[in-house]
Amino acid sequence: PLPLDEARLSIEDGDTRIDRMILGAGTRVLTQMIPATKSAGVSLWVPVGSRDEGPRTAGSTHFLEHLLFKGTNKRSALDIAVAFDSVGGESNAETAREHTAYWARVRDADLDMAIETLADMVTDSRLDEDDFSMERGVILDELAMGEDSPTDTVHDAFQLAVHGDRPIGRP
């Protein structure tokens, strides 16, 4: 087992090295260097998902995930999209029952930009009322697509059967 309480940890296996650090506020940083690659990926995982929502706030985590791409106090939605598109990168996010993850893939030379942009989105987002209406439609479309997926339908039915109407049982 990994000594998860240590602030710094390194594991090496051939050319691959994984480092783990815990920053002052408890943020965990995992890095993996693979020398043969010229690309980089970064993910910011927030330990909040649909299981943390009550009946009145159901869906709010997914909604917030979408809204964080709408801009920050320093960047517009277009600035965020162009930051990744202009370097041939990509960014996206996902909301699950137990986490929300924001991620990007870029060339290794653009990693600092990706980290800075994602961190700005997560820590300094500008939530605008006009964006709520637009994203509501986008999310409803996503939910409808999920209903067309037999795998998603079965998974959601299983979670509901196992967990009942508790938050973790809801999609």
Model-derived features: where do they sit?
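Acidic/histidine-enriched segments that form metal/cofactor-coordinating
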Residues: P1-L2, E6, T72-N73, D79-P171
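His/Glu-rich zincin catalytic helix
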Residues: P1-I80, V106, E116
